[in-house]
């Protein structure tokens, strides 16, 4: 591999033809590289999924995003995501508390908040902070929709534990809203279509002086995945713990560091040693029982799963005029059939109330690609 990745960014770019790492492709985009971007390849990558991002095809000519956590295999001349290999050690409750304390100590001079969802994962973080008597704020999304009644109840139980709590109305920051305001970015990104809610939380953090926002990303893997006896076979890969796009393009510009608590190696080691050899536990009963001393009783005795479908389809239906406008613009810029009036009509003439994954993958991928082009146009690159 030629050159090192950009240490100051979550992203660099790998030239798959030369094995060269570029810290940025902005100069090339300004020279017209964007014209060689392939929306079909981006759509295929969406189907492959982020868990196998090492298998993604180049979307912009031969350039592939090379994420900070990725490694380079010289033998195969390819990028890959390394699995985490936990350290074996005797572990008990004290070990868990020590790991959490060591993590929080890294931010002891900063004002921290937890991204409050009303679910188990963020509640564990809140419970640990409370147990350690560390002050914190709560920032999150809330909705009066019936399907989120349990999350609302848990949020209300946790409010008094924090220095202060701000909950924003999810129905005013639906998925696929504010697409025209998405920050300009170098490469198409699926997470850009969820910009609105992330931006609302980032803005709130900035207004409150919050410097670090802790998320529960990755807890599903720690607490629900089957864990082998052999730590070398541990399945944990970097991208299940963090979303680099909102961290870099939404939170960082507002002076907020988005930090996934469960990606801390000390805490990962502790949970691996406690769950080592356990089978899949999708309801996370082990975690509910193990952390019962710091959790609301409801989270210990019951399991539930948030249903975001209603929010999603509301956002989709409201955004259709904007999406069609973005597709029209993308078609004028690229001439690509995927954005043609005929293709757009075929895409949106389907029954959108059917939760068909393959249908929504196409809509989301094309929307994210069109949003990327719109950002380049705002920056004056495509004109």
Describe the function of each predicted region.
Residues 142-203, 220-236, 271-279:
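ATP-dependent adenylate-handling ligase core
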Residues 121, 218-220:
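Catalytic metal-binding/acid-base residues of hydrolase active sites
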Residues 89-97, 187-191, 257:
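Short acidic-aromatic active-site loops that bind/stabilize oxyanions
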Residues 33, 61-64, 209-210, 214-217, ...:
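Adenosyl-5′-phosphate
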Residues 92-100, 150-151, 193-197, 283, ...:
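Hydrophobic (often cysteine-bearing) scaffold residues that line and stabilize catalytic clefts
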Residues 1-174, 211:
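Cysteine-centered catalytic environments shared across enzyme families
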Residues 24-30, 44-55, 196-203, 245, ...:
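Short, hydrophobic/amphipathic alpha-helical patches that form generic packing surfaces
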Residues 46, 99-103, 128, 157-158, ...:
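Amphipathic alpha-helical segments that form well-ordered structural scaffolds
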């Amino acid at each position: 591999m030629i050159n090192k990745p950009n240490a100051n960014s979550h992203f660099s770019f790998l030239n798959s033809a030369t094995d060269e790492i570029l810290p940025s492709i902005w100069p090339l985009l300004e020279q017209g590289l964007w014209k060689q971007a392939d929306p079909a390849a981006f759509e295929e990558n969406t189907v492959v999924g982020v868990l196998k991002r090492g298998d993604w095809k180049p979307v912009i000519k031969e350039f592939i995003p090379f994420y900070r956590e990725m490694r380079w295999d010289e033998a195969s001349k390819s990028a890959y995501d390394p699995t985490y290999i936990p350290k074996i050690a005797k572990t008990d409750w004290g070990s868990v508390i020590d790991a959490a304390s060591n993590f929080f100590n890294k931010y002891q001079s900063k004002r921290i908040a937890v991204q409050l969802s009303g679910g188990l994962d963020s509640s564990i973080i809140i419970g640990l902070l409370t147990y350690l008597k560390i002050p914190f704020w709560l920032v999150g999304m809330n909705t009066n929709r019936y399907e989120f009644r349990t999350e609302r109840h848990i949020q209300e139980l946790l409010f008094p534990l924090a220095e202060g709590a701000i909950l924003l109305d999810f129905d005013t920051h639906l998925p696929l809203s504010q697409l025209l305001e998405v920050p300009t970015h170098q490469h198409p990104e699926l997470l850009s279509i969820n910009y609105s809610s992330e931006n609302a939380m980032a803005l709130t953090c900035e207004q409150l002086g919050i410097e670090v926002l802790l998320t529960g990303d990755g807890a599903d893997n720690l607490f629900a995945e089957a864990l082998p006896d052999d730590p070398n076979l541990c399945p944990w890969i970097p991208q299940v713990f963090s979303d680099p796009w909102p961290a870099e393009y939404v939170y960082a510009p507002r002076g907020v560091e988005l930090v996934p608590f469960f990606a801390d190696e000390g805490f990962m080691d502790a949970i691996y040693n406690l769950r080592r050899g356990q089978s899949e536990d999708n309801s996370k009963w082990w975690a509910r029982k193990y952390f019962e001393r710091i959790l609301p009783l409801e989270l210990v005795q019951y399991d539930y799963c948030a249903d975001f479908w209603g929010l999603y389809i509301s956002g989709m239906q409201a955004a259709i005029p904007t999406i069609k406008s973005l597709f029209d613009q993308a078609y004028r810029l690229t001439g690509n059939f995927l954005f043609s009036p005929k293709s757009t009509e075929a895409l949106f003439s389907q029954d959108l109330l059917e939760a068909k994954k393959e249908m929504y993958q196409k809509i989301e991928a094309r929307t994210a690609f069109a949003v990327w082009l719109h950002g380049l146009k705002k920056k004056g690159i495509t004109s």
